[in-house]
Amino acid sequence: MSPRSCLRSLRLLVFAVFSAAASNWLYLAKLSSVGSISEEETCEKLKGLIQRQVQMCKRNLEVMDSVRRGAQLAIEECQYQFRNRRWNCSTLDSLPVFGKVVTQGTREAAFVYAISSAGVAFAVTRACSSGELEKCGCDRTVHGVSPQGFQWSGCSDNIAYGVAFSQSFVDVRERSKGASSSRALMNLHNNEAGRKAILTHMRVECKCHGVSGSCEVKTCWRAVPPFRQVGHALKEKFDGATEVEPRRVGSSRALVPRNAQFKPHTDEDLVYLEPSPDFCEQDMRSGVLGTRGRTCNKTSKAIDGCELLCCGRGFHTAQVELAERCSCKFHWCCFVKCRQCQRLVELHTCR
């Protein structure tokens, strides 16, 4: 192997190790709770944290259970959004949680980083509003009368605190490296796009006050959207993600569209550096599990259909017995009683 090839291989290895480690904090999702463990046991022994995250943990121990919930939210939402895709957001019980897929600069990695940073911002914000954290509470900057004539009142979600904590905790590895590498720039951009997905979908919730349900006075507050809505928004951004490449702009490096004919991406868009594998066949070196054995939809022409999901390999069909509730009746008072029925269904799995 030539010296140039050796250097390139070494760079790729460092790139992969750095990229995987940047998302290792997601291993917190595998824990049942971090809130009941003392500081000494918690922060030093939590798997997947780099030293600066350990220090943040020590300074913000009460917030760490929200970070864990945010990681869980992110993984669950990723698996929901990709449940019918060739890559279905499978996780491992080791580091990195999503396997080697996140070590590559693909659009799948872009989604993982975006939904993860959004998960932390969301969970910390909700913890602030629910009174779980001493360091933050409701957003008191939202007050007075709105231009629409309603009174700002109640507990507005403190999204500013949630976003700031997510930036400090999730972005720390990339920022500690100076954010100069292509992958660091990609990760930071997608982290911010995830948080933007919450900010752009913040909503106003209101309550009417008056005699007999009239709305003489209406009080309103700002609330984060349901996390499912955030997941849908980021999935749309995934489908329209922009392939980029690093370029020096002035004295700094920036990511620009690889195809000059494409319009520049915005802060809310996802970006990626390299095309994705097809995820058809198992390749443990790149962390691809393949689609063999996956359940498919025989009648669908979409990606969940047997033709596309099974990558043209065909599929097996089996008759399976499904247990389900049936003949349900309401009994006074107050419960529903059902029978357990067996139903034969066809199950199709990829060859």
From Swiss-Prot:
**Annotated GO MF terms:** cytokine activity; frizzled binding; receptor ligand activity; transcription corepressor activity
GO biological process terms, semicolon-separated: adrenal gland development; apoptotic signaling pathway; branching involved in ureteric bud morphogenesis; canonical Wnt signaling pathway; cell fate commitment; cellular response to starvation; cellular response to transforming growth factor beta stimulus; embryonic epithelial tube formation
Keyword Glycoprotein tagged = yes
Q: What kind of modification does the protein receive after translation?
A: Palmitoleoylation is required for efficient binding to frizzled receptors. Depalmitoleoylation leads to Wnt signaling pathway inhibition.
Glycosylation, residue list: N88, N297
Cystine bridges = C78-C89, C128-C136, C138-C155, C206-C220, C208-C215, C280-C311, C296-C306, C310-C350, C326-C341, C328-C338, C333-C334
Name the GO cellular-component terms.
cell surface; cytoplasm; endocytic vesicle membrane; endoplasmic reticulum lumen; extracellular exosome; extracellular matrix; extracellular region; extracellular space
**Domain of life of the native organism:** Eukaryota
Localisation: Secreted, Extracellular space, Extracellular matrix
Keywords carried by this UniProt record: Developmental protein, Disease variant, Disulfide bond, Extracellular matrix, Glycoprotein, Lipoprotein, Secreted, Signal, Wnt signaling pathway
Where would one find the signal peptide in this protein?
1-22
Q: Where is the lipid attached (O-palmitoleoyl serine)?
A: S212
Q: Does the keyword Glycoprotein apply?
A: yes
Q: What does the UniProt record report as the effect of altering A114V in this chain?
A: In SERKAL; reduced transcript levels
Family to which this protein belongs: Belongs to the Wnt family.
Annotated function = Ligand for members of the frizzled family of seven transmembrane receptors. Plays an important role in the embryonic development of the urogenital tract and the lung. Required for normal mesenchyme to epithelium transition during embryonic kidney development. Required for the formation of early epithelial renal vesicles during kidney development. Required for normal formation of the Mullerian duct in females, and normal levels of oocytes in the ovaries. Required for normal down-regulation of 3 beta-hydroxysteroid dehydrogenase in the ovary.
Q: How does it assemble?
A: Interacts with PORCN. Interacts with PKD1.
Which disease is the protein involved in?
46,XX sex reversal with dysgenesis of kidneys, adrenals, and lungs: A disease characterized by the association of female-to-male sex reversal with dysgenesis of kidneys, adrenals, and lungs.
Name this protein carries in UniProt: Protein Wnt-4
Origin organism is: Homo sapiens
Q: What is the lineage of its organism?
A: Eukaryota, Metazoa, Chordata, Craniata, Vertebrata
